[in-house]
Amino acid sequence: MRKDMEVTGLVLAGGRGTRMGSVDKGLQLFNGKPMGQHVLERLRPQVLHLLINANQNLETYSAWGTAVWPDAIAGFAGPLAGLHTGLLHCNTPLLVTVPCDSPFLPLDLVAKLMAALQAQDADLAVAVTGQGSTRQPQPVFTLARVDVLPHLTAFLSGGGRKVDAWYATLKVAEVNFEDEAAFRNINTLAELQEFSHTAPAP
């Protein structure tokens, strides 16, 4: 792989899990093992290195054998704070982010995002599902150049927290994925039960 195409994968597990009763979503069992481990297993073949962003239970996550970093910005500042942390600790030119509650994520996620990023010479590539009225950006499934770190730092320092507001200031390549189910987030305990016997796409 060319050096300028090397990718680090970041699993975002730094949220409060409020819709799941304020539990750590990445550690909730799904088909016999923590959701975060399912995510790591599907992301690992697609990247050179792996990182986890978490703000609680750091020792538990570290036991999985992957480097774990809490937000550099205090106060559970959202997914941009996780991206910021990942960029700070990324040793490759590119960083891909995925949430810890997405055990069905596509096995071609990085390849498709990479192709669009390179073709459009974009700052970021973001997954999109659906068409027309059902079109839905998936902003936490993103591939970013590490060069955007100073820009993101300035945005966060100015109080910015909304992902779409920051993306609007950058050149973003949107990449359509046909399999909407692959981007399913498990946000509640009911969904955890409902989808616990669903097999991910190969």
Model-derived regions: residue spans:
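Nucleotide and nucleotide-moiety/phosphate-recognizing core
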Residues: 2-160, 165-182, 189-194, 200
